[in-house]
A protein has these predicted regions:
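Conserved DEDDh/DEDDy metal-dependent 3′-5′ exonuclease domain
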Residues: 2-5, 10, 15-19, 26, ...
Length: 87
């Protein structure tokens, strides 16, 4: 795997616009609800984490693999949210 495109949908009771991404992700109820991904431009797969679906192990591994280029529309937000979620 050389490239991974990602998009997430999240929830937090903290107002993102007022408090910023770090406070948003530090809220006890912060969660990633949906995780969309595409490997090497393949059709997009959506994982419904809110309903108990699991992100495939190879995708989790790719998130921390420095040899895989990650793409996201709001990369800094996605990076911070995923870093918090992966703890």
């Amino acid at each position: 795997m050389k490239t991974l495109s990602i998009d997430i949908e999240t929830y937090s009771s903290v107002d993102l616009a007022k408090c910023g991404v770090y406070k948003y992700t530090e809220a006890p109820d912060f969660d990633i609800l949906l995780f969309g991904y595409s490997v090497e431009g393949s059709p997009v797969q959506v994982v419904d984490l809110a309903c108990g679906e699991m992100i495939p192990a190879e995708i989790i591994a790719a998130l921390t693999d420095t040899g895989v280029t990650k793409w996201a529309f709001n990369a800094q937000f996605e990076r911070i949210c995923l870093s918090r979620w992966l703890r």
